[in-house]
């Protein structure tokens, strides 16, 4: 089998190029970045920010000039280099490596211990310019940076290019751990962090620093630093940079074809379409402007593609990168109270959307605003837990995030997930492939745990999301799933498709869910067959699937959930 060249968790640009890993070329954004002195680019966790930082470091570092063709040959910038390539003294900081502490003294000590090293590394890499220069002060990151800048300026040395990865990582950790008083100290007065950024601000003003490029997740810390770094230019929502991180549809399709061609030679076009549909259902949906392209989270997608390649083109059993589940800590912290958390989750898993003010998508906002209830949608947007549907509404970005939210919803509402409730039915499904018992089990064992008043609040969106979350727990090793799958006949409620290489391959189930509240329950439960329009609807979806994949055995169902009074399931 060919060597796996899908770079999951590879954030070193030189390592990626040396080892022949697949690289989605983002070097065309370099010329645009050169128009800024203090750019800040924010994206949710695991969106490829560290690789971008590494790429820029290798592009601008004067000590890497002899490797330019090796590292950038075949890329856009390799064919269109700017005059500034390999011209600077590069200092690269990574705040995500910061060790936390419970007081200012400990944080300052850890900050300095971490951030003195990059300045020393730059000095040693450029010893040909610095001769016998030695720092007169050690152990203070701001003072050492200032001393190096002063020496470089006095000797007419090249300018400094500073890169700061995850600038807000440790301050965000203070927020998620409810240590607001310490956060306030770090971002105000003459704290070690403000002093550090003041040195950078001064260096940019004097011309000794060419650029300081920061990545992060939230604009909160940058805003709370106020005058300490009021020169920051946040590019997050700028149209020309929207696709700088994350993969577009075109980039993702090219990536998928590369994987299929290399690891499953001779794969049919149908195989490509099957894989593409799975990817869109599970990973698609991020949009950072109401008019922007939809983007894939690059790290999550690469996680899938690496497993896909390692399995020689078979769908991996685990589609969710478990590292994402830690984002739930932000929901707990953001909402502050159980009531607020439940209200927000109700809006997302029941109504499937949150309304927002487009003017709130500003480049900067402070901690106080971040935790205001009316601002939750925007806060979640920056965290990557919602995305833009339109200029008025936000939604969950994809099936991966739906699963995470649904799991948290069940936790908050104390819905038991013990396997004994569900396993017997799914074991039986392995042998008889009967869909109806899955609906019965869902109604009795899952919905049966909710109090009566909940059934006046939930709707079809909740039914399909919660049904998906339950079924995917036990059948994800043999089926892939889609909710509101786009096709020419409309958007199907729920579809489960057998995974290639398993005994379930070509088995496809299309389901139309209808939910009725108590007042209509008895009338609907008395029906002996589903309403004609519902049959027509689901058959249209099934025909669409059959046209796309003629070898599939497509079966269609209409399911009525009638409050907490009963259910109906017909195969049509």
Residue ranges and their predicted role:
Residues 232, 294-534, 542, 572:
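Extended alpha-helical interface modules used as scaffolds for assembling large macromolecular complexes
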Residues 156-186:
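Conserved P-loop NTPase "ATPase switch" module shared by AAA+ and STAND
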Residues 147-155, 182-210, 541-544:
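Substrate-engagement module of ASCE P-loop NTPases
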Residues 14, 61-124:
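P-loop NTPase motor core
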Residues 1-46, 51-60, 69-77:
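Walker A/P-loop-proximal flanking segment of P-loop NTPase domains
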Residues 526-571:
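Nucleic-acid nuclease catalytic cores
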Residues 163-165, 194-195, 209-217:
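Structural recognition of the conserved hydrophobic beta-strand(s) that form the central parallel beta-sheet
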Residues 221-227, 235-306:
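Amphipathic alpha-helical segments of the small helical/lid subdomains adjacent to P-loop NTPase cores
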């Amino acid at each position: 089998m060919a060597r796996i060249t899908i770079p999951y968790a590879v954030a070193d640009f030189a390592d990626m190029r040396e080892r022949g890993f697949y690289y989605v070329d983002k070097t065309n954004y370099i010329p645009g970045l050169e128009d800024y002195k203090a750019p800040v680019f924010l994206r949710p966790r695991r969106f490829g920010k560290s690789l971008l930082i590494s790429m820029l470091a290798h592009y601008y570092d004067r000590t890497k000039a002899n490797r330019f063709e090796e590292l950038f040959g075949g890329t856009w910038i390799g064919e269109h280099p700017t005059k500034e390539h390999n011209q600077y003294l590069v200092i690269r900081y990574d705040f995500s490596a910061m060790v936390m502490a419970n007081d200012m003294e400990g944080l300052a000590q850890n900050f300095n211990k971490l951030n003195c090293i990059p300045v020393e590394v730059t000095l040693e890499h450029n010893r040909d310019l610095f001769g016998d220069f030695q720092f007169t002060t050690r152990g203070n990151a701001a003072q050492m940076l200032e001393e190096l800048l002063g020496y470089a300026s006095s000797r007419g040395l090249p300018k400094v290019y500073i890169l700061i990865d995850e600038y807000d990582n440790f301050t965000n950790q203070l927020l998620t751990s409810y240590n607001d008083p310490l956060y306030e100290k770090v971002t105000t007065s003459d704290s070690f962090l403000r002093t550090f950024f003041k040195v950078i601000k001064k260096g940019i003003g004097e011309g000794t620093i060419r650029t300081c490029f920061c990545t992060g997740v939230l604009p909160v810390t940058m805003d709370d630093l106020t005058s300490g770094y009021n020169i920051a230019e946040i590019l997050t929502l700028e149209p020309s940079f929207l696709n700088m991180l994350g993969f577009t549809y075109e980039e993702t399709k090219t990536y998928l074809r590369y994987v299929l061609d290399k690891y499953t030679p001779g794969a049919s076009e149908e195989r490509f379409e099957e894989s593409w549909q799975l990817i869109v259902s599970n990973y698609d949906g991020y949009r950072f402007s109401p008019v922007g392209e939809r983007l894939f989270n690059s790290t999550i997608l690469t996680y899938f593609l690496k497993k896909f390649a390692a399995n020689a083109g078979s769908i991996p059993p685990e589609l969710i990168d478990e590292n994402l589940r830690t984002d739930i800590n932000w929901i707990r912290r953001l909402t502050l109270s159980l009531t607020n958390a439940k209200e927000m989750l109700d809006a997302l898993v029941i109504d499937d959307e949150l309304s927002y003010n487009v003017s709130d998508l500003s480049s900067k906002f402070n901690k106080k605003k971040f935790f205001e209830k009316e601002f939750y949608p925007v806060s979640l947007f920056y965290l990557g837990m919602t995305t833009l549907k339109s200029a008025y509404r936000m939604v969950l970005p994809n099936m991966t995030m739906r699963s995470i939210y649904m799991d948290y919803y069940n936790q908050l509402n104390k819905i038991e997930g013990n396997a004994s409730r569900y396993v017997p039915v799914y074991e039986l499904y392995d042998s008889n492939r009967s869909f109806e018992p899955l609906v019965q089990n869902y109604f009795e064992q899952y919905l049966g745990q909710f109090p009566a008043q909940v059934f006046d609040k939930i709707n079809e969106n909740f039914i399909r999301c919660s049904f998906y979350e339950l079924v995917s727990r036990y059948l994800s090793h043999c089926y892939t799933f889609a909710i509101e799958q786009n096709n020419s006949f409309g958007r199907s409620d729920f579809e489960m498709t057998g995974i290639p290489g398993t005994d379930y391959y070509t088995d496809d189930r299309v389901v139309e869910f209808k939910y009725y509240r108590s007042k209509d329950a008895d009338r609907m439960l008395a029906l002996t067959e589903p309403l004609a329009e519902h049959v027509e609807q689901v058959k249209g979806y099934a025909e669409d699937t059959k046209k796309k994949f003629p070898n599939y055995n497509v079966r269609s169902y209409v399911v009525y959930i009638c409050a907490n009074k009963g259910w109906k399931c017909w195969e049509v």
